[in-house]
Amino acid sequence: MWIVLAFVLTVAAPAYAQRATVRKPPPAPAPTAPIKAAPEMTCPTPLGVGVTTKQTFCDVMAGRDPAAGILIKLPPHKGPVTLTFDLHNRHTYSEEQTKANRAYARYTATIGVLAMDNTLISRAVVQNEFRKARDLVDRIGGGAGPGGVKAVAPTGDEPITITIPEEEGEVSILGEKLAVDRIDGSATYSSPGRPIAVISNVMIEYRPPPPKPVRKRK
């Protein structure tokens, strides 16, 4: 009798242990959906608004101090931020030179996207040739020229995509150098304060940080 009872207890113990409830860890919160939006941007030298595209164009000036560049403030985010914009060259349009077939110019502009501690994140380049008025991206309103447009206009259109590291809360865009080839010769410009290029259509894509857990009241 004692042998049978001992056997039953031995067998029943593992069965009881198997019926014990195992608590699973709570599921990880789903990642927040990415947001694409126009960022908060400070443009120290606006070129103006396009007559046709209605886009706002901003001059990129040469310089070495990030605080003096085009400032793009990044909202709170989780992971890297994707910065996109259109990069253009600058052309001073002359109807007289265009009709005389003497308006040809080839532009190569190089700019940098920097962290606020002056660390270079990435460079971007736009190169194009101007021959006729159709090579302009748009005309800029608010000028004294015919039709109330400015002589300076964006030419060339290079879509740029830059990945901003997660730890950055603000970045700066500064011009590095501009190479110009014309009928009468070539020149390179890089002195601080000189316009190097133009940007437009600035956007960012980012994931907001996950919401903070709500503390339960005791």
What are these regions (language model features)?
Residues 2-12:
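Bacterial N-terminal signal peptides
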Residues 9, 16-41, 210-218:
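Compositionally biased, proline/threonine/alanine/serine-rich low-complexity intrinsically disordered stretches
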Residues 48-61, 121-168, 180-182:
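Extended, solvent-exposed segments with strong compositional bias
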Residues 55-75, 80:
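Non-catalytic, beta-strand-enriched accessory regions in extracellular/secretory proteins
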Residues 77-85, 161-181:
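Noncatalytic modules at the cell exterior or secretory-pathway interfaces
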Residues 84-102:
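Short amphipathic, basic-aromatic surface patches that mediate peripheral association
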Residues 96-109, 191-192:
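Short coil-to-beta strand junction motifs in C2/discoidin
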Residues 177-218:
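Surface-exposed edge beta-strand/loop patches
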